[in-house]
Amino acid sequence: MWKRYAAVLPANPWNWIAVWRRNYMAWKKAAIASILGNLAEPVTSLFGLGFGLGAMVGRVDGIPYVAFLAAGMVATSAMISATFETIHATFARMQAKRTWESALCTQLTLGDIVLGELAWAASKALLAGTAMMLVAATMGFASWPSVLFALPVIALTGFAFASLAMIVTALAPGYDYFIFYQTLFLTPMLFLSGAVFPVSQLPDIFQKLSHLLPLAHSIELIRPAMLDRPGGGVALHISALCIFAVMPFFLSVGLLQRRLLS
């Protein structure tokens, strides 16, 4: 059994680049529309909640509410971009377009393909998160140096959510099933991770639950950087995101092996 599983793992450290490049070549034809689409929801939330609700809320943790919200929207934009790329575009390449089927006829293994797809989703998340942060910095809700410090965190956040979404992609019979992942996992996590309001406002049980959510760890790294504040538990948050990035990858490869190669 181990030999069968090992045979579908990445063949070498660079094969995935071919998959990434193929996706990039297809994406760049509609790059502007893709970027605007990924920015629409977080930017709308930033302006709608930040200025509308912010006028009533005032300050949160000593800062204007819109500045507090901006960091949450940066992490959220990375989450949304990586997730939707994986559960929709990747699923289409695997199921409807049969792009994976063609790729498996080459020297690429299933692991190479999955790793390339995750790297591409993380790249789109990095682009979306960076664009959102530039909007926040332009409006004065983030320091410009923080953009550079937050880039690795945004990329890692994208990879982590892409890995989690790949499990859903491996299990879902069709597109209709993705709505369960969005409504039962992503939406509750948005409100439990400190993106919209401080986690300290939640009941104790939900505060403890937030420590298990990848979005919470991402926000705990991005918000202090954007606000030029010292952050605590940096190693813990990075380690948690790495676990969410790596473990689901291996699990999804095993699930996809059963689905495609059995």
Swiss-Prot record:
Residue span, ABC transmembrane type-2 domain: 33-259
Single annotated GO MF: ABC-type transporter activity
Cell compartments where the protein resides: Cell inner membrane
Membrane topology listed for this record: Multi-pass membrane protein
Coiled-coil segments on the chain, per record: none
Spans traversing the lipid bilayer: 35-55, 62-82, 125-145, 147-167, 177-197, 236-256
GO BP, sorted A to Z: oligosaccharide transport
InterPro entries the UniProt entry points to: ABC2_TM, ABC2_TM_bact-type, ABC_2_transport, ABC_transptNodJ, Nod_factor_ABC_transporter
Principal subcellular localisation of the protein: membrane
A cellular component annotation (GO) from this entry: ATP-binding cassette (ABC) transporter complex
One Pfam family linked to the record: ABC2_membrane
Domain of life, per lineage: Bacteria
UniProt keyword terms in alphabetical order: Cell inner membrane, Cell membrane, Membrane, Nodulation, Plasmid, Transmembrane, Transmembrane helix, Transport
Binding partners and assembly: The complex is composed of two ATP-binding proteins (NodI) and two transmembrane proteins (NodJ).
Role: Part of the ABC transporter complex NodIJ involved in the export of the nodulation factors (Nod factors), the bacterial signal molecules that induce symbiosis and subsequent nodulation induction. Nod factors are LCO (lipo-chitin oligosaccharide), a modified beta-1,4-linked N-acetylglucosamine oligosaccharide. This subunit encodes the transporter.
Family note: Belongs to the ABC-2 integral membrane protein family. Lipooligosaccharide exporter (TC 3.A.1.102) subfamily.
The protein's name in its UniProt record: Nodulation protein J
Native organism: Sinorhizobium fredii (strain NBRC 101917 / NGR234)
